[in-house]
Curated annotation (Swiss-Prot):
The gene is clpP2. It comes from the Bacteria. It is an enzyme of class 3 (hydrolase). Cleaves peptides in various proteins in a process that requires ATP hydrolysis. Has a chymotrypsin-like activity. Plays a major role in the degradation of misfolded proteins. This is ATP-dependent Clp protease proteolytic subunit 2. CDD domains: S14_ClpP_2.
Length: 203
C-alpha cells in the first residue's frame, strides 16, 4: 500500500492538514508517479479538468516518473492535455517510459523538460493474446493499429518521421536527457525550477 504524506498549512485561521497531492494541486501541479492505469488516468484527468475550470489560461505542470502502462489510459490523458486551453508544462523526473514518454512529449512545445539524470524510453505496444484463432487475429490487428496510431502521435510531438518512430520502437529505445532533446521528446534539460519558462513552478 502506498503511503501518502500529509502536510500542515497555516491558513491564517489555524492549521489545516492535507495530503501532498492536494497541496501540489493548489500550485497547479499534477503528479504521474506510477504505472498508468485506468484509475490513475481518471484521477489525473479529473485534476486537469479541475485546474482548467479554475483558470483556463494559466499553465499546468505535469511531473512524470512512470514506467508506462495501459495504452487506452495513457491516450485518455493525452487527449485531455490536448483538450485543455492552457499551456501544459511537462517534466520528466526519474523515468518516462512507453506511455510516460508519449505524455512527456505531449506538453506544450518549448515547455517540455527533463531533469539531468532522467531516462526516457519508447517501444512498440505489446499485449498477451489469448482466445480463439479469430480472437487472436482481431487482437493482433488491434495491436498493429495502435502501433501506427502511437507512431503518428509521437511523430507529431517530436518532429521525427513515422517511419523512424516505428523503426526505433521495434525494441526498447532508451534516451538520456540530452538525447531526448535531439529526438524531440523534450525541449530543455533543467536542474532548477529557475531554468524553466514557468517561474512559478512551486509557490
Amino acid at each position: 500500500m502506498t503511503l501518502v504524506p500529509y502536510v500542515v498549512e497555516d491558513t491564517g485561521r489555524g492549521e489545516r492538514a492535507m495530503d501532498i497531492y492536494s497541496r501540489l494541486l493548489k500550485d497547479r501541479i499534477v503528479m504521474i508517479g506510477q504505472e498508468i492505469t485506468e484509475p490513475l488516468a481518471n484521477t489525473v484527468i479529473a485534476q486537469l479538468l479541475f485546474l482548467m475550470s479554475e483558470d483556463p489560461k494559466k499553465d499546468i505542470k505535469v511531473f512524470i516518473n512512470s514506467p508506462g502502462g495501459y495504452i487506452t489510459a495513457g491516450l485518455a490523458i493525452y487527449d485531455t492535455i490536448r483538450f485543455l486551453g492552457c499551456d501544459v508544462n511537462t517534466y520528466c523526473i526519474g523515468q518516462a517510459a512507453s506511455m510516460g514518454a508519449l505524455l512527456l512529449s505531449a506538453g506544450t512545445k518549448g515547455k517540455r523538460y527533463a531533469l539531468p539524470h532522467s531516462r526516457m524510453m519508447i517501444h512498440q505496444p505489446s499485449g498477451g493474446i489469448i482466445g480463439t484463432s479469430a480472437d487472436i487475429q482481431l487482437q493482433a490487428a488491434e495491436i498493429l493499429t495502435l502501433k501506427k496510431h502511437l507512431a503518428n502521435i509521437l511523430s507529431e510531438c517530436t518532429g521525427q518521421s513515422v517511419e523512424k518512430i516505428i523503426e526505433d520502437s521495434e525494441r526498447d529505445f532508451f534516451m538520456g536527457a540530452e538525447e531526448a532533446i535531439s529526438y524531440g521528446l523534450i525541449d530543455k534539460v533543467v536542474s532548477s525550477a529557475k531554468d524553466t519558462k514557468d517561474k512559478d513552478t512551486i509557490s
